[in-house]
Swiss-Prot record:
Disulfide topology: C3-C17, C10-C22, C16-C30
Domain of life where this protein originates: Eukaryota
Record remark on domains: The presence of a 'disulfide through disulfide knot' structurally defines this protein as a knottin.
Tissue expression profile of the protein: Expressed by the venom gland.
Functional note: Gating-modifier toxin that targets voltage-gated sodium channels. Inhibits the inactivation of Nav1.7/SCN9A.
Secreted as UniProt keyword: yes
Taxonomic source organism: Poecilotheria vittata (Ghost ornamental tarantula)
Family: Belongs to the neurotoxin 10 (Hwtx-1) family.
Protein name: Beta/delta/mu-theraphotoxin-Pv1
Keywords recorded for this protein, A-Z: Amidation, Disulfide bond, Ion channel impairing toxin, Neurotoxin, Secreted, Toxin, Voltage-gated sodium channel impairing toxin
Native organism taxonomy: Eukaryota, Metazoa, Ecdysozoa, Arthropoda, Chelicerata
Amino acid sequence: AGCKYLFGSCKEDSDCCKHLGCRRKAPQYCGWDGTF
């Protein structure tokens, strides 16, 4: 499966690649979580 990249659709943070987190509200996509 692999992880979702920036702006990839998601349901939770674990769907996203490292340093990305899932947005809590619509539209739900992976965004940078502020970490390096």
